[in-house]
Amino acid sequence: MLIYLIPTAKEMSQNHTRFPATFPKKSYPILDVLANLSVKDLSKAYRISEDASQKEWLRIQALYNHTAPTYPAYKLFNGLMYRYLKRDSLSPKEEDYLKNHVYITSALYGIIPASFPIAEHRLDFQTKIKIGQQSLKHFWREDYNQFIDANQTYVSLLSSEFEDVFSTDQRQMWISTQFLEEKNGLLKSHSTISKKARGAFLTACIAKQCQSISDLKTLDFIGFSFSPELSTNHKFVYIKKEA
C-alpha cells in the first residue's frame, strides 16, 4: 500500500466541525514543558514576537487544561501545501483514500492519520526546547522509525526539517519527491514551487486512487509530469516545462 508522509503547517483555519479534546500519551512530556514556559520564554523558543507568544501561550494552556477544541488535522492546517490539497467536496472514495493513505508528521502529536483530531498549535522541530535532555527530534526518533514498515511503500512529501527526525536507514526505505520548474531553459526549485506541487501531487494521487509506484509515474498536475531521466528508484522528479 502507498503511504504518504506530509508535514504540518504554521497557518491554520478553524472553519470546520469541532471535536472533543484528545491527546496522545506520548505527547504529555512535551506539553508539560510548554505549559511551564512564560510568554517571554515562548517568544525565545519559537523565535516569534511577544504578541504571537501570548496567543500561543493561551493555546498551550487550553491544551494543558483539556479545553482546547480539536479539528481534523488535514482541515485545520492551512499552509500553502494544504491550500493546494483538495480537502472539501471529496467523494466518499477520495475521502477514504486520504484517511487511509495520508499521515502527518507532527512535533507535538507524532505521526498521525490525516484526519486525526488536533488542537491549534505552532510547535515544530525548529522550536528550541528540551524534553529532559532530548531535542524534539531525538524525543520522537524511535516512534518515527517504528512507523516505517518494510512491507509498505512510503512517499515522502516532507521538508528536510521533518525527514531528519527519521534515522538514515528509515529514510532509505521511502521514495522522496522533487518538483522543478523550467525557466529560460534551466530547471529551478524553491520553497513556493515545492509546497504548491506537494499539495497538487497529493490531490492527483487521491483523485487517481494510486495503488502502485507505476501509478505515480503517470500523474499530471498543475503542469508537472514525471521525469524518467532525472528520477531514480528512490527519488521521483516531476518537471513543469516552459509553455
Curated annotation (Swiss-Prot):
Cleavable signal peptide: none
Pfam families: H2O2_YaaD
A Gene Ontology term for the protein's cellular component: cytosol
GO biological process: response to hydroperoxide
InterPro entries to which the protein is assigned, alphabetical: YaaA
Homology family: Belongs to the UPF0246 family.
Name assigned to this protein: UPF0246 protein SUB1767
Protein source organism: Streptococcus uberis (strain ATCC BAA-854 / 0140J)
Highest classification ranks of the organism: Bacteria, Bacillati, Bacillota, Bacilli, Lactobacillales
